[in-house]
Amino acid sequence: MSITAERKQALVAEYANKAGDTGSPEVQIAVLSERISNLTNHFKFHKKDNHSRRGLLKMVSQRRRLLDYLKEIDQNRYHTLIKKLGLRR
C-alpha cells in the first residue's frame, strides 16, 4: 500500500524544482498521487477495508488542497503538473 523509498526518490527527482526539493507542491502532489493510485488498486481486492478508505479520502482531500494552492500561486505550474500526472481538470 505504501510506496517504496526508491519510487519516492524517483518522483522527487522528476518533479523537484531543484536538487533535494521535497517540500514543493509539485513533489507532494506527485507522491500523494502515487499513494492514491496504490490504494485504489488495493480496494479492487479489499472492498470492505473501510479503515484504509478513510485514509484514502484524507489523501485525496490533501492533494486537492495542494492543487488549489498551486493553482492560486502559479497557474502555469498547475496546468503543467496536472497534464504530466494525467489528472482530470
Curated annotation (Swiss-Prot):
GO cellular component terms listed in the entry, alphabetical order: cytosolic small ribosomal subunit
Name the protein family: Belongs to the universal ribosomal protein uS15 family.
Database matches in InterPro entries: Ribosomal_uS15, Ribosomal_uS15_bac-type, uS15_NS1_RNA-bd_sf
Name of encoding gene? rpsO
Q: Which SMART domains match?
A: Ribosomal_S15
Protein name per UniProt = Small ribosomal subunit protein uS15
Subunit note = Part of the 30S ribosomal subunit. Forms a bridge to the 50S subunit in the 70S ribosome, contacting the 23S rRNA.
Q: Name one GO biological process term.
A: translation
Question: What's its job?
Answer: One of the primary rRNA binding proteins, it binds directly to 16S rRNA where it helps nucleate assembly of the platform of the 30S subunit by binding and bridging several RNA helices of the 16S rRNA.
Q: Which organism is it from?
A: Bartonella quintana (strain Toulouse) (Rochalimaea quintana)
